[in-house]
């Protein structure tokens, strides 16, 4: 059966069953549910449109919204699935969640009893040959196709498969050859010609029940000869279709073709209108085509908020999930954060793609050098990474009123990007100097925060968005010295004395009066030696001394500096009358 005809200007798109839509889009694609809280990122919307960024407004502010309408549709010409969303920008009071777990994840409504068994295959030149057949992987034949009757020779059956538009196709499934293999023969060439499939495209076979089979298509993008992508006219859905001036359909009309550049599916006018309406607080609509290498630009608020509450630093090991080509499983790739800020490019200072990752397998992820914080997860806790840098705790800062600015657990979350009120003053640049960071942070790359406001954006007018607690403006902190960053006792009394972990804690008495002269003795192991830390504190800066196991003492200035990345060539030793008899280690 031939699929229904469609014209390039047809906007009567057919809604697709959500389970079939998600199977065609891929398991890694996340579409928030109706009435959920989301953030709209204009940068991602622009990336889905065209590379001519200069024609669009350079907005870098994420817009908090509520989804008021969702349509899961399929392109009438290419069979590619896409989502049409209507978003309503929200104010701070309207956007605050009623029940929100800071590190929780919003999974939406998933019906376990309505899942689809899926298998996708990238077409080989033989599969895409007009007169050839389709070689069916054994896993697909066993898990998606109905079982063959192997009592007959050769085992053969007829399959009736429904495409994304509801058209039914029939294929002959046979098990033959030397060695024997599963093949689709009769009916396959007709399907290839009708769908204009080429080698590199993917077909997705889906089984929803014992007698319901579906087939979908994923197009492979092909760059133009000049490396760019020009735009072909059309509506906001069919924005990259054109009509051939040479090839004709059977009825004599111009043959419809489409670009495979990966861009141009959306018009610049539609994207510009959406960005302008969003900035004015008006409802706006967006169209999203899920595709490999493109990030969702309408993201669940819970995912963004939990990821932006993390204190991302260079050297952090992360992992990212990616769907395999056959959609059979999710593969996790690991890497190390090399940069947490975009110094160049059109989105400089924006949280969009702010993390630069050095992957363990760069040849596989060579086109995924920058990702969004919500696309990755911490691969392991700091104590599991065997890194020379100790785990740094989040600091508690005094408010101007004398109390502490804290979250639910009593600790302030450093606002990673500047998504807060413009009324907040800039933090003092001195608090970001190398000398005032804990020793484990001295190896991290720092930036000139003199022109960096608390929202993380460059310039003097930070956006009036992202006003949740974890994105609240910092108070006027002044200078933070090593008085606030002293070595404390290990978090557990049962910690092994041979542990190589160096524990760092923030000062718990940042404001108020200190007690009388006191002495603390703690120990850490550094470069194979046990170091005893003695602290004398009175009303004022703490005086610390580092004592080795043999009783000798290393003098320390008020601003303690420890470089954990390289052992010092020599450590001067001074006698300590308070220590016991010394011995050679």
Swiss-Prot record:
Gene3D superfamilies: 2.30.30.1040, DNA-binding pseudobarrel domain (2.40.330.10). Its main location: nucleus. Keywords: Auxin signaling pathway, DNA-binding, Nucleus, Transcription, Transcription regulation. One of its GO terms (cellular component) is nucleus. Residues 573-585 have a biased composition (Polar residues). SUPFAM superfamilies: DNA-binding pseudobarrel domain. Transmembrane segments: none annotated. One of its GO terms (biological process) is positive regulation of anther dehiscence. Residues 488-510 have a biased composition (Low complexity). GO terms for molecular function: cis-regulatory region sequence-specific DNA binding; DNA-binding transcription factor activity; double-stranded DNA binding. It is found in: Nucleus. Residues 119-221 bind DNA. Pfam families: ARF_AD (PF06507), B3 (PF02362). Residues 483-517, 535-585 are annotated as: Disordered. Changing residue 518 to P: In strain: cv. Ag-0, cv. An-1, cv. Cvi-0, cv. Edi-0, cv. Ei-2, cv. Gy-2, cv. Kas-2, cv. Ll-0, cv. Mt-0, cv. Nok-3, cv. Wassilewskija, cv. Wei-0 and cv. Wt-5. It comes from the Eukaryota. Belongs to the ARF family. Homo and heterodimers. Auxin response factors (ARFs) are transcriptional factors that bind specifically to the DNA sequence 5'-TGTCTC-3' found in the auxin-responsive promoter elements (AuxREs). Could act as transcriptional activator or repressor. Formation of heterodimers with Aux/IAA proteins may alter their ability to modulate early auxin response genes expression. PANTHER family: AUXIN RESPONSE FACTOR 17 (PTHR31384:SF94), AUXIN RESPONSE FACTOR 4-RELATED (PTHR31384). This is Auxin response factor 17.
């Amino acid at each position: 059966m031939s699929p229904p005809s469609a014209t390039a200007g047809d906007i009567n798109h057919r809604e697709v069953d959500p389970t079939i839509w998600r199977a065609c889009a891929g398991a890694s694609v996340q579409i928030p549910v109706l009435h959920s809280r989301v953030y709209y990122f204009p940068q991602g919307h622009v990336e889905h449109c065209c590379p001519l960024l200069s024609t669009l407004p350079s907005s870098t502010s994420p817009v908090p919204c509520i989804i008021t309408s969702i349509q899961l549709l399929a392109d009438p010409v290419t069979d590619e699935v896409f989502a049409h969303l209507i978003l309503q920008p929200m104010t701070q009071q309207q956007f605050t969640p009623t029940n929100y777990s800071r590190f929780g994840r919003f999974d939406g409504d998933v019906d376990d009893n309505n899942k689809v068994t899926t298998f996708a295959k990238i077409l080989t030149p033989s599969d895409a040959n007009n007169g050839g057949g389709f070689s069916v992987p054994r896993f697909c034949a066993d898990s998606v196709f109905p079982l063959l009757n192997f009592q007959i020779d050769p085992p053969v059956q007829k399959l009736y498969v429904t495409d994304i538009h509801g058209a039914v196709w029939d294929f002959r499934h046979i098990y033959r050859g030397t060695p024997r293999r599963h093949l689709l023969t009769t009916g396959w060439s007709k399907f290839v010609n009708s769908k204009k499939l080429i080698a590199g495209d993917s077909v997705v076979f889906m089984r929803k029940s014992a007698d319901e089979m579906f087939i979908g298509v994923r197009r492979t993008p092909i760059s133009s000869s000049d490396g760019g992508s020009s735009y072909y006219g059309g509506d906001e859905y069919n924005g990259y279709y054109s009509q051939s001036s040479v090839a004709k359909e059977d009825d004599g009309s111009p043959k419809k073709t489409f670009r495979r550049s990966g861009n141009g599916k959306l018009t610049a006018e539609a994207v510009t209108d959406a960005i302008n309406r969003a900035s004015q607080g008006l409802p706006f609509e967006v169209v999203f085509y899920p595709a490999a290498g493109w990030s969702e630009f309408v993201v669940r608020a819970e995912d963004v908020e939990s990821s932006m509450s993390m204190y991302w630093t260079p050297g952090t090991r992360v992992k990212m999930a990616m769907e395999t080509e056959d959609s059979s499983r999710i593969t996790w790739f690991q890497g190390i954060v090399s940069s947490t800020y975009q110094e160049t490019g059109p989105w400089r200072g924006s949280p969009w793609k702010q993390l630069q990752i050095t992957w363990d397998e760069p040849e596989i992820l060579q086109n995924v050098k920058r990702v969004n914080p919500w696309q990755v997860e911490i691969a392991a806790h700091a104590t599991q990474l065997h890194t020379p840098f100790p785990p740094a705790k989040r600091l508690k800062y005094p408010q101007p009123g004398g109390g502490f600015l804290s979250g639910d657990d009593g600790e302030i979350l450093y606002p990673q990007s500047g998504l807060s009120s413009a009324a907040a003053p800039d933090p003092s640049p001195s608090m970001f100097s190398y000398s005032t960071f804990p020793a484990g942070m001295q190896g991290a790359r720092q930036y000139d925060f003199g022109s960096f406001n608390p929202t993380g954006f460059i310039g003097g007018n930070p956006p009036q968005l992202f006003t949740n607690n974890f994105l609240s403006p910092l108070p006027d902190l002044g200078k933070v010295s090593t008085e606030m960053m002293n070595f404390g006792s290990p978090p557990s009394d049962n910690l092994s004395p041979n542990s190589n972990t160096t524990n760092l804690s923030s000062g718990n008495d940042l404001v108020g009066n200190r007690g009388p002269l006191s002495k603390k003795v703690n120990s850490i192991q550094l470069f194979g030696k046990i170091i005893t830390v003695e602290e004398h504190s009175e009303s004022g800066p703490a005086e610390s001394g580092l004592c080795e196991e043999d009783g000798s003492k290393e003098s320390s200035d008020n601003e303690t500096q420890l470089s954990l990345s390289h052992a010092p060539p020599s450590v001067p030793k001074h006698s300590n009358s308070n220590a016991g008899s010394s011995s050679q280690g």
